[in-house]
Each structure stands twice: as C-alpha cells, then as structure tokens.
C-alpha cells in the first residue's frame, strides 16, 4: 500500500524526465541518495514503534519525543500536508484520464467530472477497509511496475541507443550542475512510505510486519527508481538523453516505449498511469483518514470523526470528511476555470511535499530527544544514531527543496514564499491549539498524542 502511495509509474513517466532534463545522466543516482537517506530515517522511525504502538505515526512520535505542543502542531501539519498532496494529485489524475480517454476513445470529458468520479472511487475503496484496499492496490501496483520493467528489459535486450554503459555512476555525472535540484524531485518520489505505521492496529503481527514493510518499501523504491531512470538513459544514450528530456518532458517514456516495445504498449502505459495515480489517491486517502481518526480520538478534532464503520472497521467518518473536502476543492477550482496541472496540482502539492519532509526532520529530532531523555542511549544505540543522521540528511534535503522550489512550481518568488510559508502557518496554528487546550481544556491536552494510555509517557509536557 505504501509503495502504491508513491505511484511509481506516475513518478517515473511524469517526473523523472524533468529530473533528467535538469541533472542529465546522473539523475538515477539522486534516487539512490534519497533512498539511503530515507533508509536511515526508517531505522529511527521504526525504533519509536515500541514506544508508541504506531498510533498516529508522526503525531504520536513527535509528542512522545518533543512534547504535546509540538506533537499536536505536527498532527495538524500532517493532516493538512497529506490532504494537500492527495487533493492536488486529483488534478494530475484528471489530466491523465482525459488524455487516455481521448487517445483511446476520442471522447472529450471535462477534467472536473473525471476528478469527481475518481473521488467517488477512492471513497468507496477506502470505506471498505485495509484488506480490500491493500488487495486492490496490490493489483494496480503489479501492473504499473510490470509495464516499467517490460520497457527497461526491452531497452537492455536491444542494447539501448548506443550500447549499455555506466557513465551515470561516475563522479562527473553525480556532481554535475543541476544535480542539487534533482534531489528535490528524488526525495518527493518517496512520499507516503512512512504511512506503514498508521496501519499497525489493523496489521497482522505488527511488530514484524510493519518494520519489514517499511524497509522493503524504501529499498524497493530506491533500487527500482534508479534502475528505471538508468534504463531510460540507455534508451536515448548518455550523450543525448538530457536534450531529449528537455525537448519532450511529457512524452519521453512514451517515446521510449513506442521505440523499444511498440505502440500497443504505449497505449497500455497511458491507461496504467491513470490507475497508478488512482492507487496513490487511495493510499493517501487511507493515511489521511487514520491521522484524522487519531486526532479525533484524542479530542483535538470533533469526536464524531473517531467513529469506525460498523462492518468494515475503517475510519469511515474521517473518510467521509476527506471526500467532501476533496470534492469541494475540485468543484471550486473547476468553477474558477483553473488549470488542473499548473494551478491545482502544483499549488497544493508544493506545500504538501515541504510539510511532509519537515515532519520527517522533526520526527528524527523527536527520536533523539526521546532516547536521550529516557536514558535509552545504550539500549537503542542504533535508533539514536539513525535519528541524528536522518536529522542531518533530511534537514539538508529540506533546504535543497526550498532552495529549488521554483523547479516544482515554476512560479515567482512571492508565490513560492507564500506556498512554503503556509507550512509554517499551519504548524503555528497547531501550537496555538495545543496552548489553548493546555490552558482551557486540560483533559484534552493530556490526551494529545495518545499518551494517556502509555505508561512510559511524560505527563509534564
């Protein structure tokens, strides 16, 4: 489910060409670098599951390590960031669906209609619980990774444009101008993998399955992304791939598919990109619902949202709210005549990506603070070291992302400042809410982070 959230086919066909256009043949290495950073973070992240039981993930972990004020602020930021990512991608999904239907059937359907249909499908699957959602996403994930592997194998079997070579992994390629900007895209490609912890209460044997799923997801994405992008370098040749990507960002993968596999595979890939984005939407919908449920359970949001479905046991009330919010935003953008890609996807996704990486940095700090405060330095030495390293690595990634934000938005300085600043505004609002609860509703404040049933939690923060 967490790999489906990252939408491998959408990330590769939709975003990797831009990474190649900016960074050239060294772009595949950026995905490995991001994967290594997230692997270190995953070690620290999983070290906290024993202390929190995985309830609320970022929300609980940060509360346990840095206190309830930071915890609630992070919980609010997580809900808003995931919603921004998920609702923004409906714009991309609508564009992809429109193009696929137009290419195959010759029918022109307005993008808001397609987005609203997708919202209904996501609501239906999410409502039926993790088992149905996981099986459905598993099928879609197999199809989208399968078509990418077909392309990569065909390229390698035919020897690429000028033979198979490995200049991608040379220092000249890795440290080429533009590679710092490529890292922003590479880190964004891993969005959602940390949501494994949100399913702890619904998983079988969570002490083993959750860490295993997290490490497997990070490792698979890092190697798979690097391999596929490297294969595209072979398809066009190291000397020409950057120019080819710059000239034809949208169709780079489709052109390679037509050349090395055939037009039939190109049609299949255009349809699977739609299902790839749909799978991502379902996975993010489920993550949002569980964050909302955790906050409502603790009284930080209306308690009506902590109700589960009587049959499927999914957080259905939270799912209903998320669905309504998505529909309202899509309708508003549609009525305003906004562009679904440049004005919906980019405007909403940018603060979402910044917010999630910021939360990962804060979580890394929380791991370090918790183990030091509880004197677990010796017992959790690996988790502590991983927390320090991931704070540094992800902190640098966040700085690179903000410094190169124009590559994601193609907007001016003022607009970019507003988008990045909105992340800070949400966090400050969360701090304000926590301070209000501490002063006026102490019982609710005591419940923040789910720490009211944790015998090891501090009651003073």
Predicted regions and their residues:
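Helix-loop-helix junctions that connect adjacent transmembrane segments
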Residues: 27-28, 104-110, 138-270
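Membrane-helix boundary/coupling elements in multi-pass transport proteins
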Residues: 54, 77-92, 197-202, 263-303, ...
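TM-loop-TM module centered on a large, flexible mid-protein loop between adjacent transmembrane helices
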Residues: 60-61, 67, 99-103, 219-284, ...
């Amino acid at each position: 489910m967490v790999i489906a959230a990252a939408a491998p086919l959408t990330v590769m066909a939709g975003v990797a060409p831009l990474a190649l256009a900016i960074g050239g043949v060294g772009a595949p290495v950026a995905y490995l670098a991001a994967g290594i950073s997230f692997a270190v973070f995953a070690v620290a992240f999983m070290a906290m599951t024993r202390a929190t039981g995985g309830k609320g993930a970022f929300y609980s972990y940060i509360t346990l390590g840095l206190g309830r004020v930071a915890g609630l602020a992070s919980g609010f930021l997580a809900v808003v960031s995931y919603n921004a990512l998920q609702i923004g991608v409906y714009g991309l999904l609508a564009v992809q669906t429109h193009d696929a239907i137009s290419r195959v059937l010759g029918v022109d359907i307005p993008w808001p209609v397609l987005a609203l249909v997708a919202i209904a499908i996501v609501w239906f699957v999410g409502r039926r619980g993790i088992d149905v959602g996981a099986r459905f996403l598993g099928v879609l994930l197999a199809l989208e990774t399968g078509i990418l592997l077909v392309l990569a194998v065909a390229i390698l079997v035919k020897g690429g444009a000028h033979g198979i070579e490995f200049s991608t992994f040379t220092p000249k390629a890795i440290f080429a101008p533009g590679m710092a900007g490529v890292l922003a895209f590479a880190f964004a490609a891993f969005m959602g993998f940390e949501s494994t912890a949100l399913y702890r209460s619904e998983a079988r044997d969570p002490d083993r399955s959750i860490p295993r799923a997290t490490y497997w997801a990070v490792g698979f994405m890092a190697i798979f992304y690097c391999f596929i992008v490297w294969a595209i370098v072979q398809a066009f040749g190291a000397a020409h791939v950057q120019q080819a990507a710059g000239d034809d960002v949208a169709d780079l993968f489709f052109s390679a598919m037509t050349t090395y596999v055939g037009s039939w595979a190109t049609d299949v890939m255009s349809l699977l990109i739609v299902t790839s984005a749909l799978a991502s939407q379902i996975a993010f919908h489920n993550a949002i619902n569980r964050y909302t449920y955790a906050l409502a359970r603790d009284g930080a949001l209306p308690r009506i949202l902590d109700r589960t479905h009587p049959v499927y046991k999914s957080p259905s009330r939270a799912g209903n709210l998320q669905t309504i919010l998505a529909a309202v935003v899509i309708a508003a953008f549609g009525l305003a005549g906004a562009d679904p890609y440049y004005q919906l996807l980019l405007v909403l996704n940018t603060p979402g990506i910044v917010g999630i990486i910021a939360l990962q940095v804060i979580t890394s700090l929380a791991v370090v603070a918790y183990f030091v405060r509880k004197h677990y330095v010796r017992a959790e030495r690996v988790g502590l070291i991983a927390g320090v390293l991931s704070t540094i690595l992800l902190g640098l990634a966040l700085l690179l992302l903000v410094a190169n934000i124009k590559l994601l938005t193609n907007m001016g300085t003022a607009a970019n400042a507003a988008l990045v600043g909105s992340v800070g505004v949400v966090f400050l609002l969360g701090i304000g809410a926590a301070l209000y609860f501490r002063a006026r509703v102490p019982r609710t404040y005591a419940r923040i982070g789910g720490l009211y049933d944790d015998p090891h939690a501090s009651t003073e923060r």
